[in-house]
């Protein structure tokens, strides 16, 4: 195993690992991604289940592709396109009076004027909190108590952002953060289809239910993507393929069928990884995605 202190190994070629690897390479690091599967993508893959028919095998909708990532990595030229954006949610009713929920309107299902008004306030509040979370997600988390100037500025910005919500909304976000989607939706709405559609959008793919703790935060996290719901042309595999293409263009080496069995240490520092076949890859940094 040769000395490669400037080398970074990223474990896992899912979308998070590929984005991480691409940004590290963009910053001038020498990066290798190791993936146990035969292809990159993780849960964002497209599979052919019958000759000529393909489907997204796990994740099937794109919620949170940050526009900065899309631009920084030139994903549009790397193969990413969409067959549909700003998708609507439909909640089916037994009597055929289905509910149709778009970004700006709710129709059908005998929605009352009270629920329509409540929906406007709900969207205003959740949208405001999501925009706050979006700003926080795009900052380097400040280290509390470090005394570092940048950390102190980061903490001040975070405190100011929360304070700028105003007293009422600030109290409301503190309250909502500790309860669940079910309780919030019960407070705001009467229509069961509307509550079902909103709770599904909030917890889909999160291994949570509407009554689970932190399910409100999960919904806010999804809304903080700020781009709405999109359907990639060719399935979710095209997202991973575009990320892999962008990463490789930046010099990232992607190795598939390369399962990591352990992270290697030298004293109290990481020095590489060992693969299933016994091969060792030296690295000054290891990122597990």
Describe the residue ranges of each PLM region.
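Alpha-helix capping and helix-loop boundary segments enriched in small/acidic/polar residues
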Residues: 12, 56-57, 207, 211, ...
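Helical element adjacent to the flavin cofactor pocket in flavoenzyme catalytic cores
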Residues: 218-270, 274
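Rossmann-like flavin
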Residues: 94-212
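Core beta-strand elements of the Rossmann-like FAD/NAD(P) dinucleotide-binding domain
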Residues: 4-6, 275-285
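Generic recognition of stable, solvent-exposed alpha-helical segments in well-folded globular domains
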Residues: 13, 19, 121, 176, ...
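Short acidic/polar mixed-charge low-complexity motifs
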Residues: 53, 95-97, 269, 277-280
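Flavin (primarily FAD) binding-site architecture
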Residues: 288-289
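N-terminal glycine-rich phosphate/pyrophosphate-binding loop and immediately adjacent elements
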Residues: 3-145
């Amino acid at each position: 195993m040769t000395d490669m202190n400037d080398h970074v190994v990223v474990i896992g070629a899912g979308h998070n690992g590929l984005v991480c690897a691409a940004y590290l390479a963009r910053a001038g690091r020498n990066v290798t991604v190791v993936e146990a599967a035969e292809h990159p993508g993780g849960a964002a893959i497209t599979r052919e289940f019958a000759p000529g028919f393909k489907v997204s095998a796990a994740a099937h909708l794109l919620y949170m592709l940050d526009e900065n990532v899309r631009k920084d990595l030139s994903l549009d030229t790397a193969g990413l396109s969409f067959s549909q954006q700003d998708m609507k949610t439909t909640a089916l009713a037994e009597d055929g009076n289905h509910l149709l929920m778009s970004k700006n309107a709710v129709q059908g299902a005998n929605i009352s004027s009270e629920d329509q008004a409540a929906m406007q306030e709900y969207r205003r509040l959740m949208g405001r909190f999501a925009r706050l979370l979006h700003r926080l997600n795009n900052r380097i988390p400040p280290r509390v108590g470090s005394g570092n100037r940048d950390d102190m500025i980061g903490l001040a910005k975070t405190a100011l952002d929360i304070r700028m919500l105003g007293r009422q909304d600030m109290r409301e976000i503190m309250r909502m953060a500790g309860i669940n989607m079910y309780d919030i939706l019960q407070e705001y709405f009467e229509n069961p289809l509307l509550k079902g559609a909103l709770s599904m959008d909030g917890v889909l793919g999160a291994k949570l239910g509407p009554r689970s703790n932190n399910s409100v935060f999960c919904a806010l996290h999804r809304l903080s993507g700020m781009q709405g719901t999109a359907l990639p042309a060719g399935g979710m595999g095209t997202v991973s393929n575009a990320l892999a293409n962008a990463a490789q263009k930046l010099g990232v080496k992607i190795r598939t069928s390369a399962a990591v069995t352990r992270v290697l240490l030298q004293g109290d520092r990481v020095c590489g990884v060992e693969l299933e076949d016994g091969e060792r890859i030296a690295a000054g940094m290891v990122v597990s995605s």
